Amino acid sequence: MDTFGLKIIASDRVFYEGRCRKLVIPAPDGEKGILPNHENMVIAVKIGMARMEIEEGNWVEVALGRGFAEVVNNRVTLLVDTAEKPE
């Protein structure tokens, strides 16, 4: 399956930078799913849990603060207040 570039930037560090197969992020109007070759867009991100599939069947959860996601040219950049691994 195709992948896309994903970069998660918190206010204090780059949390993740690499390839991703699927991404689900919390948005004010519900969860948004992003797949490879998604159309370009900007999405508001609300506080909540994001899920990303790095390898087939290997899902990773990330606790996100407020921010936004930019989807452009098969790359997704998440700019958020905080990004943490859930405990």
Language-model features: locations:
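Intrinsically disordered, compositionally biased charged tails
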Residues: 1-3
